[in-house]
Amino acid sequence: MLDRLNRKQSKERFVNKIPISTTKIDKSLEHTRRDDESNNAKRGVNPDESYSSDTSFTPTVVSGTEDAALTRTSTNRQRQGKSSFKSFFRTMSLKVNSKTRNKDRKTKEELAAEKALAELRNLPRNPLDLELNELHVASNFNEVRKIIDDIFIDENHDAASKAIRISTQNKSFSAMEKPYSLTKIKSLQTEDDYSLPITSFIIETLEENSIHADLSHNDNAITSTDILIEEEEEMEQEEEEEMLNYDDLDVISDKIDEVGAESSISTSNDRGIIANATANGPIIVGDSTESVDTSNIENRKLVVVNSTPDDHDYYATNDMNDNFITPNPSNESVETLAGVYKDFEVTNATEANTEAGKTTDINAETSNAIDAVADTENKVTAEDDATDTVNTGESMTDTTTSTTDNKNDKEVDKEVENAVDSNVTTNDTIPDKAANIDNESSSDNSIDATTANTTNTNNFNDAEVNTEATNTIVDNVTNDKFNSVDVSTTTPTATTVSGIPTADEMTNNVNTNRISTATVDSFTGKTGENYESFITNAGKDSNDNNADLKTPTNNSATTTTNTQSGVSNKKSNSKTGSSEQNPFQKKLMNYLNSLN
């Protein structure tokens, strides 16, 4: 059976671990679903009993594919136990000792490595056509963490500094920011964190983690950086994801063949990358071969190119200078690395604009310097002009002085006095007249006009004000009347009507007479009458001299009771001793009832 599975492993999936002994089934299987016609049910076997070797089921390998090629024809008893053994293998695979594992069978790590290498063989050919090292698969998760921690991230590259997501077969690891400034990551995906999913990768290291390659065994060169490829899915999902599916790789190969060799990526010869690719060019990961030329590794850069099914390619480098490989697709339909190429062009344009801006700033500073020099020259010229003016003034003064000296002192004084008097007279008379005339005429006219307008405005406004005041007075009067009625009828502090006690008096009187809460019949009122008589005669004083509130004497007559003069008129059918009560009596009844 095992040999048959080994022959089928390239096309079908199989259970990875099969226990040697099946004489005892785990008790957890007692909860598995069984048909009522199960052989166990017919034989009456207790699920807790151990199965003997002659009644145990033959292990049935279950295929997860639709055609179920490995599901062999079996008896009814074997078919009934198929689901049980499926769960059984799943449970026992966690308990099987590693020594019981079939040594001929490949481990999951080895199968994952084969899948990764198969994907790499089907990647598009690289521009430099370098060789790719065969991956060395690590043996435990701790080595993977060490590798992830050694990933160098440019601390100045904010987007890439967040995290690099490395997607291996089904497992994703996140490498957090490290204090290195070596690797810059770019991706075609427009994601915020610039995640770079790559199926396989080689990390170029410098001093911290250098790669030691044995060039004499180029195909089998092993680096000190071990890579673990591990599944992410749990045991239930391993049925679909744990085995290598060559059909998927064939699809990848077919899609690559459809693109055609004429659409492969080429690099610009103008940069001279091809000439120094072997000696100084970057290390390319993602070629169709299985080895990498690691010569002169200290001075070379890392480039990772990856292709995944139904996805774009990814490009990573830690250098943006001469060794940066510029993708130049020969066919516009090819999306491989096109986004990176555009980003690189944009980066160059941005840098060019930055340089142009710096040049502009320098030119502006130069212009400012020239302006400053010009200002200085103008200032000097202005100072020279001022000096010339002063000199001219001095010469004129000298001439005047010399002329004045030739005249008699008396004449000079007389001329000066006359000139002063003349000026004073002119200044005193002419401006005063002009000012008086202008001011008076303009002021008079403006004042008159303003006064007239003011008068008219005041007259008009007075009418409005009077009207508004009249309306206000009417409203206030109305409100006062309404308020007086409202206050007198609703507030307990209204003007007391003769003969009707206020609320406070009522409370005091009731408390004074000590209302009994045990029964209503025991109540003794203010006048010494019983409860019913007191309620009927409510509102009377002790002398029965209430002029405003009269108690009807006719038991059958319907009268109008004036409860409060000027406030409200209410009609009540009052009968002595009847259940009909006026509003005051109702309020009093409610109050008394509330005391009980």
Curated annotation (Swiss-Prot):
Keyword Transcription regulation on entry: yes
Basic and acidic residues: compositionally biased ranges: 25-40
Gene: IRO1
Compositionally biased residues, Polar residues: 49-63, 71-84, 534-548
Induction comment from the UniProt entry of this chain: Expression is increased with increased iron.
Annotated GO biological process: intracellular iron ion homeostasis
Deletion consequences: Decreases virulence.
Ranges that cross the membrane: none
Function: Transcription factor involved in iron utilization and virulence.
Disulfide bonds listed in the record: none
Low complexity: compositionally biased ranges: 434-461, 551-579
Protein name: Transcription factor IRO1
Keyword annotations of the record: Transcription, Transcription regulation, Virulence
Entry annotated with the keyword Transcription regulation: yes
Chain positions covered by the region annotation Disordered: 25-84, 378-411, 424-461, 534-596
Organism superkingdom: Eukaryota
